[in-house]
């Protein structure tokens, strides 16, 4: 994607594990992305804000946006994208739910959310 503007929505590791990876992942995003949005993925019983802050410390030379609500983070990336931009969304893949505190699960599908939000963004631009 050389020559393309890259906007990255970066999920993290799930709550309660692999905290050491968080700043490393954000540092890699800083290296390869022009804009970075840090968001929620699967917090389980860990504070999602703490997870995102743990990622943010890995970004040294850019100012990432921190948006807890994953749909809002995706929408923001799409709203700021121009024709030809690359929007990379990481973290959930095909996972069917977001896992929250006390075993809660929210049904989730990144691909469907992107489609829904892109339709809204494109509709607003007409």
Residue ranges with predicted function:
Residues 1-126:
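ATP-dependent carboxylate-amine ligase
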